[in-house]
Amino acid sequence: MRRACFVLALLLMVIGINAQNVGMLKVRELTLSNGMTVWLNEDHSQPKVFGAVVVNAGAKDCPNTGIAHYFEHIMFKGTQEIGTVDYAKEKPWLDSIAACYDLLAATTDDAKRAKIQQDINLLSQKAADYAIPNEFNTLISRYGGSSLNAGTSYDFTFYHNVFTPQYIEQWCRLNSDRFVNPVFRLFQGELETVYEEKNLYSDNIMSTALEKVTAELFGTQPYAYPVIGSTENLKNPKLSDMKAFYEKYYVGSNMGLVLCGDFDAETITPLLEKTFGRLPKGVKPVRGVSPLPDITAERTVEVKLPIPLVSAEALVFKAPTDYDKDANALKVALQMLSNGKAGMLDSLTNEGKMLMSAATTFSLNDAGAAAMIVIPNLLAKTAKAEAASLQQVQRLMAGDFSDESLLVQKQEIYRENARSLETIEERAMTMVEVMSSGHSWREYIENVEAVNSVTKDDVTAVAKRYLSAPFVRFSKKYGKYPKDRLTQPGYKPVVPANRGQESEYAKQLAQIPVREVSPRLIDFDKDASISKLGDEAVLYTVKNPVNELFNLSVKWNRGTLADPRLDAVDALLNNIGTDSLTRQQLGNALQTLGADMSFSVDKSSFSLEVTGIDKNFKPTMQLISHFIGNMKADEKSVKKVVDGAKTNEKSLTESNTDVLKAMLEYAAYGNRASTLHRTTAKEVKAMGGDAMIDAFRKVTSSACDIIYSGSLSNDEVRAIVGNTLPVEQSRQAYVDYSYDPMPYSSPVVYVFNKPDARQTLFFTYEQVSPLTTVQERIPATLFDQYLGGGMSSVMFQEVREFRSMAYSTGSRIMSRSLKRHASSPLAQITIVGTQADKTMGAISLVDSLLRDMPMDEKNFLTARQECVNEIYNEFPSFREIGAEIAAQRRQGYTEDSKTGWSELLRKATADDMRRFYESHIKANASHRALCIVGNKKKLNLKELSKYGKVVFLKEKDLFRK
């Protein structure tokens, strides 16, 4: 324990943690009587708790079957007490379903399989007579929960959400009970949902490519197979195997609990013992390992990607895992090579010799790898770019770097670790990852601290050991992989008979007394110091309670809607130096100060982000001032921007999601859609570097908000910023560049054909007439949540849960500032991702829901509570609060925009929501747009025409090029 305290103290010194806030990093580790590991981290900076249950079982423990991932889905279906009105009567039907699935897995004859599937469908409908859909989610929401989710990786599975602190007893009861007696109910629908998830990954070009890379590297090892499993195995699930998986791995001795946030870590142990201590201890399973096989000889493997023009390759070397004795030295070595600013490989990019040369590492529990990414300039030879990159690796092996640069990179790693622990969610996720790796928090701290002791000899030694070894060269080849097809089985919908019902368990849980707490809202006067620096420049400073690292964000009120060329300007500024500093020299200077600088742009603003150490704030800002005042574009940096624009232009419609986003803009804004005003590659080339810099100069005359979070006082920051940033140039008044969503006089159906899409994406869009007060917008907010905001929403239950028509469903209200644009219309959209052969059924279903919305009082109450929970659980972190205040003030607010919302939400009724629906949505069916991205061969055009005039869109209709 003394050793751990010493190491923690040393780490805190290096990264500048404030002594009075050491508790934020303190993790209390304990073990319950059943062997369950518990990590507690108390942090009162935000009024919420992040809770996660970790199971040391993942895809490597059931390779290629998808069982771990299947079971993750099942864990939301309830228990013998949650999610059922009578488990004793439900159980025989569930047992029969399980037997049928086992029989299905052993049957190959198509006719016999079809008969078994129909039997499963009939049995599932009988079992549904006893099920209460989504009761677990409903109870989580009722007791302050939000962001409910889970994830399966190769090494572990975890279940998590955020909740309001006064409900910690209910959270512990619910999340322990769900693991004691889980029930495999409503499995038919969940099985098809997993099919839909498989479709989603298949349409993602990077996911498919990474699967090929992983399979090539690991061969027959468990890590070789995708987490979700093979299509063939997905079609043949065995519930008996899942039950065996649960009994083996879901035991106290193999599980962990992480709580991080606003609770008392010293007094919570009895509650945890009473709840999570009830899980069976079991025998901690002996898990297999999945090492990366030795790479004995260099080999080249082609990987298909449908990205034109660009050549690319990745050289993958075997490397140690995170806690191996060589891991930290290799981490430093790779940081020396590639850090995004001034590494040895970065120099090749900074000097325009190639589009990218970078190094990275990734680690699983049993295997590690290092990769070097090489992307030559357009039309240049990959072999030449590879040789230049390997030459930089040779420099590293030879020790051709200074002691100062080594120290700088070690400090950079420390800062990255410090930043990863700043907020409740980030820290909790780090705790989950460390716990699942089988190491203690003390070992994690020691491992981070060990970076400080890495020497130059250590770096050169590991570079020679790992980066001179044989590697696998993955070479990009233009093309796409064929997709295996999943077809819908023709099941009848399984609609539970007990929607809106409540189990006896839920009634008992309601007896636990709850302390009423008001939501914490942003106080513009207390949560930030606000001061004017010029006519239209405002400074916001927020105290950093954790460490002595600062963030400075400068947000100018000019984005791509005002000047589409700014996309290219942003790219240029991230790649140039000044009249006296090359990009590499600028990067070195920033790193020496422990700082970083980057530019970004969106539709309404152009931003400069600076991070660093507070003790170096003044020299850092002086360097930024030098860059802003003396930036200089060279021919190579301009060419890099042009090449990037060309590549992007050739890939505008490769991603189905990108096409969907463009269609949404087109549907909502017509010819005003930003994609129709994008700057073409030809125009970028014609601009040249000087014109791009001039465009940035014009940006700095716009209104700007400067947001600082750090340990310096407002007066100190004001003095330094006022002397280093061009705040006096910000004279143009703030402009709101958002547009009103447009109406449709008649229904229309837009279709963008994607012949190889395994999944169809579609959305509905309709304008909603103005809602001019908070009181009018409350029912709209409730309707949006009720329609598609969570697992108890209409879209989730009717489209995904009951009818297995989709994996992704949702809805969203698009609105402008109530203070600035009270008289502006709003818009309502619904979004669905569905298997291609289910498209017409899914469209028909969504249309019927919008025309005749099912009203359920219990689900309304859940939606209302979820809206309240968002207000309670979304108080921003210290890094976010300044930007939130700035944004709200620009939108006309003088106090938190959510002031009074929780009270009004609680008073709202289902009738209020129904009236909004009937007057704004149901009555609007003839003014709706339906937009579809998918394979037109899967569409029935005659049937589709019932929803409006069918218009096929082409690339030129959505993108200017």
Model-derived features with residue positions:
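Positively charged n-region of N-terminal signal peptides that target proteins for export
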Residues: 1-4
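Hydrophobic h-region of N-terminal signal peptides that target proteins for export
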Residues: 10-18
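Proteolytic maturation boundary segments
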Residues: 19-37, 264-306, 311-312, 316-318, ...
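M16 family metallopeptidases and their MPP-like homologs
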Residues: 39-41, 46-61, 67-70, 84-177, ...
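A common structural junction motif
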Residues: 177-184, 275-283, 391-401, 625-635, ...
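Short, conserved secondary-structure transition motifs
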Residues: 195-203, 291-305, 410-421, 610-614, ...
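Hydrophobic, small-residue-rich alpha-helical packing segments that form membrane-like cores
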Residues: 186-191, 207-208, 222-233, 239, ...
